[in-house]
């Protein structure tokens, strides 16, 4: 009987315990993207939330409920669309993080009538799929890699900024300060405003956001008015002399070119056309 009891214990340890671990604790999260792969994978649209007349948040499903996209913070994916028999690609930064999202990922997309990939995404119906590959990009945010991040965003260029801010807000050990200047045309164009304000509420001593509008629709608008100029950057973002500071820029090409010149005028080191992680001014 003693031998049978010993055998039973061995069976429990070898067979039963691993099964309990698997079903009680759950399967290990699996990253779907592989930087070593160069082929595109298909993911179905499972939800679409309309934010403005031409901008929506798109949620795409991953193969399994416990999968994560596998995208380092600050990097982007490449989306492919076949337009008139020709493959066209564009880069997008998901707003979701592996740390807080399983089974899906989210994209903030503004669709243009004359756009290629953005128009294709805007016409997707639930169940339709997109083809993506990645991760790609020269920026990979890590905890406390900078003491102060100055961010300049325009329109959907808020996506990588929001992703980085959310990562900082969720990490109790990350003490990085963030100052964001977010430019738009009208107040209704300010994307993710509630979500951004929620992040500020999580770390009010670290986060500061200033909104600028080209054309305010009301006289009591409390934010800034006009373009994001050198004076705006000087007033709201950290100076070039601040230790371990970095400026991040993402938005329409004209805005990016303008603020990039302004940062050089303000003493920041001029970056090369293709930004690198170590640059004092990084353009997504």
Swiss-Prot record:
It comes from the Eukaryota. GO terms for cellular component: endoplasmic reticulum; mitochondrial outer membrane; plasma membrane. One of its GO terms (biological process) is tRNA wobble base 5-methoxycarbonylmethyl-2-thiouridinylation. Competitively inhibited by NAD(+). Inhibited by mercurials such as p-chloromercuribenzoate (PCMB) and HgCl(2). Enzymatic activity increases under anaerobic conditions. The keyword Mitochondrion applies. Monomer. Component of the 2-(3-amino-3-carboxypropyl)histidine synthase complex composed of DPH1, DPH2, KTI11/DPH3 and a NADH-dependent reductase, predominantly CBR1. Interacts with KTI11/DPH3. Interacts with STE20. It is a single-pass membrane protein. Belongs to the flavoprotein pyridine nucleotide cytochrome reductase family. Induction: Protein levels are highest during exponential growth phase and lowest in stationary phase. The chain crosses the membrane at residues 7-27. GO terms for molecular function: cytochrome-b5 reductase activity, acting on NAD(P)H; NADH dehydrogenase activity; transferase activity. It is an enzyme of class 1 (oxidoreductase). It comes from Saccharomyces cerevisiae (strain YJM789). Keywords: FAD, Flavoprotein, Membrane, Mitochondrion, Mitochondrion outer membrane, NAD, Oxidoreductase, Transferase, Transmembrane, Transmembrane helix. Residues 38-142 form the FAD-binding FR-type domain. This is NADH-cytochrome b5 reductase 1. The gene is CBR1.
